[in-house]
């Protein structure tokens, strides 16, 4: 299994993409909205990807809910994480969050997609990049809601990825556009932002972690996604995490501080990442594949989905019909709530 996760351009593979997917360093593929037209087309694209790849790839998507849901038409419209507690309270919201985790995972597994990069464990709604993607402004409540969501995901056969370690919730800048800096004392980050990660790791509920492209300037001059301190010292040694560490997308401006594409990829692997994401830049991806030394990402093979349900079976089930309706209603309530603020 190779350590590089790539993307593809459209609704079906072109000849160059088939060739790239056969490269031994490619171990994963992430899908975006541009890859989706309808469920049948998506299923065929996944089949093409599987048949073209040398390795048994981990196929991923960001299907969190709210504003980050890559596949919408033909799938349940998932509400933003914040809406569960904000509109339903912790108890009823937690119950529906667990059902949301189950339904999201089932809908993706029916497409033969292994993981959705979820849930978001960032605390609070200040950050432009996070906002409603966070379950709550209190770390204990983020933890409680995330536990329910992950329980649902895992019951469907999907592994959970917590993001963005050690916490992106307190910085207003968007790491897709620049390198955010969080100047808060290390003790505050550890006590506040890291709590959901720390506790979920102790419960053995996180299968993977995605670090933040944020510089925590009181701690380390490198963004967490390229920092041996955060990934090896804190995440691996202090917290005892033995799951998969993903880099966030090395094409984001927040990663530019790490150098060229090949340098960014090597830096992320050297820092402790198991798998690096290189998206939205074909030349950058090819550069990484051409320049990385051969390496195996053995932990990543743990992330294959374990589900066997078909789309037809899922949508015929009473549970899916009930939960899909409840989630759609909450999504619509949340849109109305936001419009009235």
UniProtKB/Swiss-Prot annotation:
Binding site for substrate: 62, 70, 133, 163-164
GO molecular function, one term: beta-N-acetylhexosaminidase activity
Superkingdom: Bacteria
Pathway: Cell wall biogenesis; peptidoglycan recycling
Gene Ontology cellular-component annotations: cytoplasm
Enzyme Commission designation: 3.2.1.52
InterPro entries the UniProt entry points to: Beta_hexosaminidase_bac (IPR022956), Glyco_hydro_3_AS (IPR019800), Glyco_hydro_3_N (IPR001764), Glyco_hydro_3_N_sf (IPR036962), Glycoside_hydrolase_SF (IPR017853), NagZ_Beta-hexosaminidase (IPR050226)
Span of the signal peptide: none
Catalytic activity reported: Hydrolysis of terminal non-reducing N-acetyl-D-hexosamine residues in N-acetyl-beta-D-hexosaminides
Main location: cytoplasm
One protein family per Pfam: Glyco_hydro_3
GO BP terms, alphabetized: carbohydrate metabolic process; cell division; cell wall organization; peptidoglycan biosynthetic process; peptidoglycan turnover; regulation of cell shape
PROSITE patterns in alphabetical order: GLYCOSYL_HYDROL_F3
PANTHER family: BETA-HEXOSAMINIDASE, BETA-HEXOSAMINIDASE-RELATED
Summary of the function given for this chain in its UniProt record: Plays a role in peptidoglycan recycling by cleaving the terminal beta-1,4-linked N-acetylglucosamine (GlcNAc) from peptide-linked peptidoglycan fragments, giving rise to free GlcNAc, anhydro-N-acetylmuramic acid and anhydro-N-acetylmuramic acid-linked peptides.
Protein name listed in UniProt: Beta-hexosaminidase
């Amino acid at each position: 299994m190779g350590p590089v996760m790539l993307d593809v351009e459209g609704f079906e593979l072109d000849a160059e993409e088939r060739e790239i997917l056969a490269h031994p360093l490619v171990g994963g593929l992430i899908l975006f909205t541009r890859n989706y037209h309808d469920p049948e087309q998506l299923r065929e694209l996944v089949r093409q990807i599987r048949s073209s790849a040398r390795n048994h790839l981990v196929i991923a998507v960001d299907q969190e809910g709210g504003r980050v849901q890559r596949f919408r038409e033909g799938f349940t419209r998932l509400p933003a994480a914040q809406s569960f507690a904000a509109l339903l309270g912790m108890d009823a919201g937690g119950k529906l969050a667990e059902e949301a985790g189950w339904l999201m995972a089932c809908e993706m597994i029916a497409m033969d997609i292994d993981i959705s990069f979820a849930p978001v464990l960032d605390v609070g709604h200040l950050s432009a990049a996070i906002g409603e993607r966070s379950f709550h402004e209190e770390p204990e409540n983020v933890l409680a809601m995330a536990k329910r969501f992950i329980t649902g995901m895992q019951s469907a056969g999907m592994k959970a990825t917590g993001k963005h370690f050690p916490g992106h919730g307190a910085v207003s800048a968007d790491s897709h556009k620049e390198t955010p800096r969080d100047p808060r004392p290390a003790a505050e980050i550890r006590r506040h932002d890291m709590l959901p990660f720390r506790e979920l790791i102790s419960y053995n509920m996180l299968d993977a972690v995605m670090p933040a492209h944020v510089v925590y300037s009181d701690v380390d001059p490198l963004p967490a996604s390229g920092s041996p301190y955060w990934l090896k010292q804190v995440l691996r040694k202090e917290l005892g995490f033995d799951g998969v560490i993903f880099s966030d997308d090395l094409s984001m401006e927040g990663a530019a501080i790490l150098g060229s594409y090949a340098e960014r990829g090597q830096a992320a692997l050297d820092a402790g990442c198991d798998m690096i994401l290189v998206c939205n830049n074909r030349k950058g991806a090819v550069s990484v594949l051409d320049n990385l030394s051969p390496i195996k990402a053995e932990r990543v093979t743990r992330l294959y989905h374990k589900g066997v349900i078909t789309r037809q079976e899922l949508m015929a089930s009473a549970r899916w019909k009930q939960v899909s309706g409840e989630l759609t209603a909450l999504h619509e309530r949340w849109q109305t709530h936001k419009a009235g603020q």
